[in-house]
Amino acid sequence: MSALTRLVPFGRVGGRLLRGCRARAAGDSGVRHAGGGVHIQPRYREFPQLTRSQVIQGEFLSSLMWFWILWRFWHDSDAVLGHFSYPDPSQWTDEELGIPPDDED
């Protein structure tokens, strides 16, 4: 008996779906909830009115973003500047630098 009582909600949902399909087939679309309510008016060339919650959320997300960028730059700057160390210029030869030998006139 308890198995049948668990199936009762599914029967109710199925009945509602069938009634909705029959109503659409008969041309009766039911209640339309799309019009007549309060709408946000468009604001041409004006800033939108933000709520305090939206301002706080925006500040929090932008702070989190900049914290992450600066943290990663500070702790892993090779990702931005490159992975290879700059060679020591004192070990370069004159030939590599394009300087002609001293004995050549």
Curated annotation (Swiss-Prot):
Residues 86-105 are annotated as: Disordered. Residues 1-33 form a transit peptide. It is found in: Mitochondrion inner membrane. InterPro entries: NDUFB2_animal (IPR026627). It is a peripheral membrane protein. Residues 93-105 have a biased composition (Acidic residues). Keywords: Electron transport, Membrane, Mitochondrion, Mitochondrion inner membrane, Respiratory chain, Transit peptide, Transport. It comes from the Eukaryota. GO terms for cellular component: mitochondrial inner membrane; mitochondrion; respiratory chain complex I. GO terms for biological process: aerobic respiration; proton motive force-driven mitochondrial ATP synthesis. Belongs to the complex I NDUFB2 subunit family. PANTHER family: NADH DEHYDROGENASE [UBIQUINONE] 1 BETA SUBCOMPLEX SUBUNIT 2, MITOCHONDRIAL, NADH-UBIQUINONE OXIDOREDUCTASE AGGG SUBUNIT. Accessory subunit of the mitochondrial membrane respiratory chain NADH dehydrogenase (Complex I), that is believed not to be involved in catalysis. Complex I functions in the transfer of electrons from NADH to the respiratory chain. The immediate electron acceptor for the enzyme is believed to be ubiquinone. Complex I is composed of 45 different subunits. This is NADH dehydrogenase [ubiquinone] 1 beta subcomplex subunit 2, mitochondrial. The gene is Ndufb2.
